[in-house]
């Protein structure tokens, strides 16, 4: 019991869950109401404001709100409090409990973005909007189109990226620099060469996967140069009969003997594979010249002393 005619103060110590404790203090005095009224009451009202938390999902580079990410907020016991898909506006949650910790988790990033790390926050005892931001980085892929050594970028290749449904995602012509792509959605892709540069052989598809990371992911496709070989048939000029055992030397432009060819019973001989051209900075430069010289013939035949020039057409 409180004596009458005294001044008293009422202050809120704890607010209901989801609301902010008011700083308001109410003063009152019990006044004597006469000998017939043993008790005197006093009515008062406190107004509580709900807590307000504003959660932003933004692009790491631009800082703009990023639509399309799947998000949820859980309490310290792992219970889901709210879940939503981000839009071009920040997401607002009211009546989270003051003093409790909550975790914002990205369950699926927007297409072309990387899953962000979860953020944990504590709800403060304030009616002001409490803001928290989660930033997403984009995926980054660097595609190199090189010669077989992997050291020189090859310009002039027509390339295409296909998604898992064989839909074209991007097409370009290679240059002397690697091709850089941002915002490829996480998943599996195929890199396809539609047309090889002059002097190179069309290569097989390269499968790759864009992973959930903001690091640059590198993909390489290598092209081998086209090769050529000399095929010869030696016959009798009059009868057309094949001549077995005739020998030839295949020489380079400086006269160096690369190999000796000897005809078989069908009058046939084939060389090994040789480069058809020189390349400069990955580009076709000059066709390579070879020379075929008959060095040994059969008894009864005249040695052909012609130096036959050989170039390979691409």
Ranges and model annotations:
Residues 1-314:
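Solvent-exposed loop/turn and edge beta-strand elements of beta-rich ligand-binding domains
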């Amino acid at each position: 019991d409180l004596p009458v005619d005294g001044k008293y103060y009422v202050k809120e110590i704890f607010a209901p869950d989801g609301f902010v404790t008011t700083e308001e203090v109410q003063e009152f005095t019990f006044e004597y109401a006469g000998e017939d009224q043993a008790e005197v009451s006093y009515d008062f009202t406190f107004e509580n404001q709900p807590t307000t938390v504003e959660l932003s999902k933004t692009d790491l580079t631009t800082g703009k709100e990023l639509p399309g990410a799947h998000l949820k907020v859980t309490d310290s016991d792992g219970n889901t409090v709210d879940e939503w898909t981000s839009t071009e506006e920040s997401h607002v949650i009211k009546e989270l409990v003051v003093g409790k910790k909550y975790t914002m988790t990205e369950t699926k990033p927007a297409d072309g973005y990387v899953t962000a790390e979860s953020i944990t926050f504590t709800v403060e005892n304030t009616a002001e909007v409490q803001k928290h931001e989660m930033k997403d980085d984009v995926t980054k892929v660097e595609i190199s189109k090189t010669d077989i050594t992997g050291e020189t970028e090859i310009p002039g290749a027509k390339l295409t990226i296909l998604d898992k449904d064989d839909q074209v995602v991007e097409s370009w012509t290679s240059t002397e620099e690697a091709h850089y792509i941002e915002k490829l959605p996480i998943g599996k892709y195929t890199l396809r060469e539609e047309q090889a540069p002059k002097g190179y052989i069309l290569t097989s598809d390269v499968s790759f996967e864009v992973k959930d990371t903001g690091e640059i992911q590198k993909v390489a496709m290598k092209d081998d140069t086209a090769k050529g070989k000399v095929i010869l048939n030696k016959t009798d000029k009059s009868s057309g009969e094949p001549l077995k055992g005739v020998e030839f030397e295949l020489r380079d432009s400086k006269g160096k003997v690369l190999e000796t060819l000897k005809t078989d019973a069908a009058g046939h001989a084939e060389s090994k594979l040789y480069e058809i051209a020189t390349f400069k900075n990955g580009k076709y430069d000059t066709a390579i010249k070879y020379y075929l010289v008959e060095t040994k013939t059969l008894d009864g035949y005249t040695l052909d002393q012609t130096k036959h020039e050989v170039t390979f057409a691409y």
